[in-house]
A protein has these predicted regions:
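The two-metal-ion catalytic cores of nucleic-acid processing enzymes
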Residues: 1-312
Length: 312
């Protein structure tokens, strides 16, 4: 039985390092970057490393490396693989589960390739119940026992920026942005207005300039994943703006990415497009509201006006 003290220790992390607000992983160099917001000093980026790992079950019936021990040993040498048998303490359920930890001293991609060379895709049909490989950032936090936002008295100490667009239509192809509102929890408040497309170009560029100047740890909006960010990047395309030139991240070689995401709510799944900017936490506040709705039937709507009244 796990004690309350052990649970608390895990939740808060045993590593004492404070003020980490974001973690980024570089696949090319197998490097971890810790982004810290030091009170009174601002942003600081520090590089770190970790040993990637996978939890693995019994693979003997899956023809792994053709059941050849010699082939597997050669691959282990090639990819710097170490295998450790986990303690199960005679628990039958654990004995039938993921009882091995497989580590690669050469990197995260090498760990994945070790399994693929053995004709076993960790996320394929054969491997999905036998191999669990967490994303590298989660692995780093677990293995180094670090936690985000540790050391802050409360979240007001973390710089947060929220923004909202006003547009002339529902779709970017049919209208334009005529106002961008920006506010932080540190007293910054600005409204950027634009009356034509030339001013709209300048407004979008200025929006990213503000982010680069203030360097908030959290960038939030309401329904921003599928609306505000969609509008910004689509209007960039229509206006001939290269967003990679104006969207400056905290790393000179990384900018932003946009990829499909899923919000799981009990038996429902909602899709959205996640915007990620290196070094920042980009969030859509409506996702938190939708999760709260899933467990609190008194929240009747996710509309912004309703939620504002509900929490006040």
């Amino acid at each position: 039985m796990i004690s309350t003290e052990e649970i608390e220790s895990f939740l808060h992390g045993n590593d004492p390092e404070e003020f980490i607000v974001a973690i980024e992983f570089d696949y090319a160099s197998n490097s971890i970057y810790k982004i810290k917001e030091i009170p009174g000093k601002g942003k600081e980026i520090r590089k770190d490393t970790f040993i990637p790992f996978a939890w693995v079950g019994d693979l003997r019936n899956l023809n792994f490396y053709g059941n050849s021990k010699e082939a597997q040993k050669a691959a282990m040498t090639k990819y710097g693989i170490m295998i450790e048998k986990l303690e199960t303490h005679g628990n039958e359920r654990l004995e039938k589960g993921l009882t091995f930890m497989v580590k690669s001293l050469k990197g995260y991609r090498e760990l994945i390739q070790f399994f693929r060379d053995g004709n076993l895709d960790p996320w394929g049909e054969k491997g999905k119940d036998k191999i669990m490989i967490l994303p590298p950032v989660e692995q780093y936090l677990i293995s180094k026992e670090k936690r985000l936002f540790k050391g802050f008295e409360n979240y007001d100490e973390v710089t947060r920026l929220v923004f909202d667009l006003e547009t002339t239509s529902l779709e970017p192809k049919d209208g334009r942005i005529f106002m961008i509102g920006i506010k932080t929890n540190k007293g910054y408040h600005r409204v950027i207005e634009c009356i034509d497309e030339d001013q709209e170009k300048g407004a979008i560029i200025e929006f990213f300039n503000v982010i680069n100047e203030l360097k908030p740890s959290i960038i939030g909006g309401y329904n921003s994943a599928n609306f505000d960010w969609h509008w910004i990047f689509e209007r960039c395309r229509l206006l001939g703006i290269d967003p990679k030139k104006i969207c400056k991240s905290l790393h000179p070689q990384h900018s932003f990415t946009r990829k499909d995401g899923m919000l799981k709510l009990a038996n429902e799944v909602e899709t959205y497009v996640q915007t990620s900017i290196w070094g920042y936490n980009v969030i859509d506040i409506i996702h938190s509201v939708r999760r709260a709705q899933a467990i609190n039937s008194s929240i009747k709507s996710a509309g912004l006006k309703y939620i504002t009244k509900f929490i006040n």
